[in-house]
Amino acid sequence: MSIRFSWRKSFIALSCLAALSVPVTTSAQTLKLAIGEEPTEGFDPMLGWSHGSYLLLHSPLLKQNADLSWYSNMLSDYQPSAEGTTWKLTLKPDLKFSDGSPLTAKDVAFTYNNAAASGGKVDMGNFLSATADDDLHVTIALKAPQSTFVNVLGSLGIVSADKYDEKTYAQKPIGAGPYRMVSFQPGQQLIVEANPYYAGKKNDFEKLIFVFLDEDAAFAAAQSGQLGVVRIPPATAAIAKNLPNVKLWERASVENRGIVFPMVKSGEKNTQGYDIGNDITADIAIRKAINYALNRQLLAEQVLDGYAVPAYTGVKGLPWDQTEAAFKDGDIEKAKQILDDAGWKLNKNGIREKDGLEAKLTLWYTSGDATRRDLAESIRALVQPIGIQMDLKSGSWDTVERYMHSNPTLFGWGSLDPMELYHHYSMNAAGVGYYNPGYYKNPAVEKHLQAALDAPTWQQAVPHWQAVEWDGKNGVGIKGDAAWAWLMNIQHTYLTDPCVDLGTGAPEIHGSWSLLNSVDTWKWTCQ
């Protein structure tokens, strides 16, 4: 696979950078980055900016280590009650926001109560109320136990009760994160400087400058030395690793790709008037045959140039994954046998047919993403030998949304929160936004999902989450309902200045800014 960058694109990239109002050089004090799309919604944690990624300008109450254990820069103690419906939090003394004003229990209570009322992207789950008992102590009440509430504590950035204004905060945030905003020029750049009041570990970079460039322009700028950190597509990494004066980083990620199948027969519509169901994928034999026919290792090697690992669940590499979920894929003969046994016979056109219905499917994916396009084309080629014809269609998410309930659809997910399993498979989540678009429903699986949520702690929930895949009789995986064909986890790849050390952190998630999860550990290694 080759990537060509024209002289014109490189010139445009360099011209754009030259036009910016700050020096472009990377030093021990300043680091210039192009790691993702512009956060067009601004920087309000109530809205859940940047696809759930690390809150650069804010601090949540908890953070995750590389091994997914929890620690806190802001709390000296945090404990759920035995029944799991109350959390007692104790703040460390003398915490401050980035403007030097005190951060107290009043701010924590305000943040949580306001996030629950605002209807933003932050899923507050069973949250009921937060009360400031005094300056250092907060009591959070839940409507019911929720093992995943620890992830809420680890994602919602704290804002000031006295200075929060929902009309202006997204563009003029005051937080308690590792950096504070200097300036934001929409469409061009975001400049932040180190927060002198940050309660966590400070890295070596006093200033970060984020520029918003497309992949081609960012790659060209990295080669010219004008950017210190650039996120690049995995397919580009094979070329980039041989470039002089840059360092290639490959980061473990839980960002995945998978195909969701419509699980019910056609004939219904949702409240938006979109079709639900597909008579072909409603047959479990079709779903299992596709799962067996796909060679995940081949996809990882040929489409992602090896910068991906095969995945058989949507939570590969996480504690709640079921390690026995893997199976021998790329097995064309087994896939054919499954279809034969289910009555799907080859017709004169070489397409499987059953009761007058041909196995012709349309796979939808979002346009503008070369990786999804290449994956879709490869998937079509891999299922053709078993007699399934797969056409490809792409469009914006608004377009895909109209067809994802009635056609197999290529999705990307990946979170460190096991709540994602609930969103994929709970009948209560069916058709809610992009959750459970296939309208999967299995009462036995639902019981495991609810038991996982009801567990007092996330550790006690793990066996219940694992049972969602397969409990010996039921499950969402290949042994059970084969609700998805999960494909791979995509590793995140970056080019940096040779002097930049990106440190270590928890596995990166789906989202372009997730590299910042490890920002506290970044270093400048040159004198």
Regions found by a protein language model. Give the residues of each.
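Detector for C-terminal structural segments
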Residues: Q29, P39, Q185, Q189, ...
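N-terminal lobe/hinge region of extracytoplasmic solute-binding protein
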Residues: A34-A82, T90, N113, I174
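A structural "hinge/loop" feature
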Residues: G36-G52, N73-S76, S101, F149-L156, ...
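Gly/Pro-rich hinge or "lid" segments in bacterial periplasmic/extracellular proteins
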Residues: S69, L153-N203, K207, D216-A217, ...
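Aromatic- and charge-enriched surface segment that lines or borders ligand/interaction sites
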Residues: D77-G119, D133, T139, A221, ...
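Surface-exposed binding/hinge segments that line
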Residues: G120-K163
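A bilobed periplasmic-binding-protein/Venus flytrap-type ligand-binding module shared by bacterial periplasmic
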Residues: E193-Y198, N256-I286, A293, Q302, ...
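Ligand-site clamp/hinge motif
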Residues: P196-A240, R380, Q389-D391
